[in-house]
Amino acid sequence: VVSTSPTKLVNVSYNNLTVNLGNELTPTQVKNQPTKVSWDAEPGALYTLVMTDPDAPSRKNPVFREWHHWLIINISGQNVSSGTVLSDYIGSGPPKGTGLHRYVFLVYKQPGSITDTQHGGNRPNFKVMDFANKHHLGNPVAGNFFQAKHED
């Protein structure tokens, strides 16, 4: 997903469930937008938050790599609701028989306000690195991920 892993965590919670570096959560548990998202933000700085699945439709055959599930730009500090939503949240929904998928949250510090409100494509085949390069975001400052598989 990215060439340089972030050194800090983005804290993500779904009610009383916490995303913790690859723990497994069910699609039902993450159906709705997280109830809390926070990171070590600089006051007055602007950030981009993305949630992406690099394993679409499966880890063995990721022909849709990446499928982005959420994209928000121009977040003031860590006040996610202050940002501009480019793609509404969609929870995990791995197809049957595709095994565990990783759902990755990345936070980028922006050099300034992003005025281009096009994310550069559809949800499948999104490339977070291309988006970051286009907007001069550099490496992510925080990240985290969970895993999920199809629910019967």
Curated annotation (Swiss-Prot):
Belongs to the phosphatidylethanolamine-binding protein family. Pfam families: PBP. This is Protein D1. Gene3D superfamilies: PEBP-like (3.90.280.10). InterPro entries: PEBP, PEBP-like_sf, PEBP_euk, Phosphatidylethanolamine-bd_CS. It comes from Onchocerca volvulus.
